[in-house]
Amino acid sequence: MALWQASYVAEAIKKEHPSYCVELRELTTKGDRILDAPLAKIGGKGLFTKELEQAMLDGAVDLAVHSLKDMPTEVPDGLVIGAITTRLDPGDAFVSAHYDAVEDLPIGARVGTSSLRRRAQLLAVRPDLTICDLRGNVNTRLAKLDAGEFDAIVLAAAGLKRLGFERRIRSILPRSVMLPAVGQGALAIECRAGDAAILSTIAFLRDAGMTTAAQAERAFLRRVEGGCQIPVGVYAEVDADGQISIDAMIASVDGQRICRSDAHGAGEQAEAIGTALAEELLDAGGREILKEIGITA
């Protein structure tokens, strides 16, 4: 997925700036290397970004392409998110060889996911399910499903579509059941803060509406002290009039307690709206839920 994303941005830059020479450099992150443990147990923020950010700070590369959902809410000094792209699909995809939707699964069915967010929301609607950890790239995860290790798996719809696996999607989980991760479906292009040439080069990739939505979503996550591996879901969108709406939840890992609410307002107040919604959910029980998994908010 990471190589596809980098190649996509490289090709877009070459098309927009035909005279530019764009070189791809593959770097492996901690999150890529450790595949035999659940992401939540590896711990720490920046599992999929730290090595790339160090390479930029060292001057080895000029920019890095990330899934926005994998980015910590705090960017290291000297770096900046120079562009956030149009969101492809924010949804979570239900993938199965035999079943069309979560409600069709038999009692006790095995569902694969590496996400505490997905685990919690699945168990909220189907507490009988057996949720199993699933790591590896998209091809590896699909192969494990096809080998019969799981009755179903849940993956980001955008990733499946980008890699040409849209036909494997049996259904998209509705947001009433499954709120996505922060920034899910969008790409973030990170670069050095003072590199005016690179910032100008990637400006055409910026999506104004998605950038505003991401400000609200990331402000929410920042306030709840969350990395990308906590049971928190949030989705924001901006309408044609510049008004933003945001829906968010904090859940217990077993899915039996969910604090959920929404908020609306002017897009110019995106960060304040996201932060205020986080405060509301923390006060409504989210703080106690997060404390149980070692997070003080």
Regions picked out by a protein language model, each given a short descriptive name:
Residues 59, 107, 148:
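Structured loop/turn residues at beta-strand edges in well-structured enzyme cores
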